[in-house]
Amino acid sequence: MNLDRIEQQAGHLPAYQIADSVNEALMESANLVITAPPGAGKSTLLPLTILRGMSDQALEGFIHNHLKSQGKILMLEPRRLAARQIAERMAQILGEPVGKTIGYRVRFESKVSDDTRIEVLTEGILTRMLVNDATLEGVSCLIFDEFHERSINSDLALALARQTQEIIRPDLKLIIMSATIDASIICQALQAPLIESKSRMFPIETIYADHDIDRYQVAQEMAATICQAFRNQEDDILAFLPGQGEIMKCEELLRSALSSTEIYPLYGNLSPEKQRLAIAPSKPGERKIVLATPIAETSLTIEGVRIVVDSGLCRKLVYDARTGLSHLETVRISQDMATQRRGRAGRITSGVCYRLWTQTSEHLMPEQRLPEILDADLSSLVLDIAAFGENKPELLPWLTLPPKGNLVLAQQLLMSLNALTPDHDTHALSGSITAEGSRMAQLPCHPRIAKMMISSDSPSIQALACDIAALLEEKDPMGENEDSDMTLRLSLLRSARCKKNLGRWNRIAQIAQEYRKMLRIKEDNAPIDAEEVGHLIALAYPERIAHATDHAGNFKMSNGNTIFIDPCDSMAANEWLAIASLNLASTSSSSSGQGRKGRVFLSAPVNWKNLPAQTCENISWDSKALAVKMQQETRIGALIIDSKPIQNANRETVSNIICEAARKDGLSMFDWNESVHRLQQRVAQVAEWHPELEIPDLSTEHLLPTARAWLPFYLEEGGKMKTSVTELKKLNLCEILWNILPYDLQQEIDHLAPTHIRVPSGSNIRIDYRLGAEAPVLSVRLQECFGMTSTPTVDAGRQPLLLELLSPGFKPVQLTQDLASFWQGTYFEVRKELKRRYPKHFWPENPLESQAVRGVKR
């Protein structure tokens, strides 16, 4: 290990100017934050200078004595390509091959040895190391490079590392490095000093478009701008596009326009060999164009690039908590991402950056990208935390706390997969890992896929699960427009393996092989049982078991959503399917099938008899039948396989369901007749007059939400429950409401607000209590009041009634609360008119001395 070469080979890099400051800071602080612009050399240089400081024992107390000669530095990189290139560059500086002093570990690939002192890792590798050994024995320092990307794995790895540092390894050093991060927040959280590299990048000219890029014409607009840049500028071009599809379309257009120019795609699914070709220097005298996803944003140096063309778009994986599906969305990049991309043009010399958006719209872009942990599927994260030994994820020292709702969903999924078992503590998010969960956590894949791979002890079924897992992880080699038959793809994969002619199946075959190594099983290319494929998929995605609802391609899934499969698809003819991959747009809460634009991509037939079904009672309110539905059902999730009526359902359950239905739709469930409304008005009137009586609220607005307090007592009669609206409408609601009141209040209300009053004619006339009116109303024919000297009252004489005096034809002729004054004055005018209209009736000149009558009297 020749560390003297560091200054010779990399001393010119701007980051070398802060190397001593970094080592000095690590003597005083456990944590450190470093910022440096793109191209400063922080990723390739600083790990080496820290290692040199350790080897020279320049950092007194940096590590425990027993680690001084063997403590490793682990540096995390977000992407595999960057990890490989950085390791190769550091090894080159030392004049050594990769795998000696400098090594790397990425998924399914590693180059390390017993002599390795610096390991460049992708983030999932560190998480696995922490889970397997929380002490990180033999490790002195962790470096989180390009931390501004805030991937879910980097946030998790940092949280676990901080927990280790706080509880077990106070000597462990944590370093955060980035070019575009808000360092103040990180420094405060980690109580870490900040060291900034003030070096300047080479000048970069920025050219903005006159309009924002059309998302439906990304390849076309990018190709046009690349051609413009190729004609107007010199040197190589690095173009950023959102995804592989746009790259392939743009490449096709450019090969027609610039046929003599080397064009290289660069994205994650490419083989390492093709990725190395893309980042290698162009041939002398030739120019090249690299079409890349955000994989080339950070850490990578592509020699010869002086021109950047930026679409301003990227793919973002978004988790939909409603459906449990994650899907890719094409979104605008943030300003810090734009800065990173622009910086690719000024790493070696001055450059030019073409931006396919206007300068005005740039101000609308968010300054920083959101941490992935805020809208990601947290299932793997929660399982890793449980395997680490922490049952309550929210207690870890997070920089950004994961959303509680997504944590709950993740734990529910893991419990359904038997990876976690609930703790007794119901007041916090908690779940202990099971033996099966521990096995799942050892596999570098989503818990769903891990569940599928460990579900059987049969080597042939495990081998089949490995093939399925590999197919699900990689882009479908047959394309999305082909038949959705998963078994067909598996057969083609196995056939290609047998013929040693993998071609487009090569990457999938490699992943399947790595999984088989982990499970210690051999390759199996035997014929495939399609229903076994479906059964394995159902283990991974139990909520995506689907049952045909018609013969037109409509299916209902066990999570309640509906999907559509093209009737021409071979899988559409099956009654039962297990869905491995689907377009989010194809899910719907409607069974009509209208408006669906997506479809199922991968599926397999499944025998429902081999799936775990549950027998349960379904007691619910049927809004169509307007009655309680009482069935014993055999179910797979929302799919009903068998249903039988229940004769003697639990009475309390039935009662609660009716009360809940009443809360939502009680106005139409009971007979709210005029008598009920009059009672409610009368009771409310007394409550208004006498609040000291504390009369219960009998208003409909109060009764329906509180139905559980008064309704259950009347739902059973003769040992039989009333379960339908027809039966409920027969309830005497007036009697029920009156009985809500204690007996003493009933007596008081009858005294203060009688329902009727006797008038001189002998008739009992009903009093109309109208809450909010001037006074209760007594509507009575004028002739029946002859001889009544004063206005009748209620409320123990405190409230005169409002008399609505009527003609013999029951038409109002006068309103008054002063009957005595009426007899002395207005009566004579009214008498004249009534005498003319009703000549057969008796209209005396002295009504106070006349006998009240009900009908005609002369």
Mark where each language-model region is.
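A positional "C-terminalness" feature that preferentially activates on distal terminal regions of long
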Residues: 537, 568, 628-858
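Short acidic-hydrophobic surface loop/beta-edge motif
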Residues: 194-197, 553-558, 753-760
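Second RecA-like catalytic domain
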Residues: 44, 253, 259-260, 265, ...
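Active-site lining segments that contact anionic ligands and/or coordinate catalytic metals
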Residues: 29, 351, 463-466, 532-534, ...
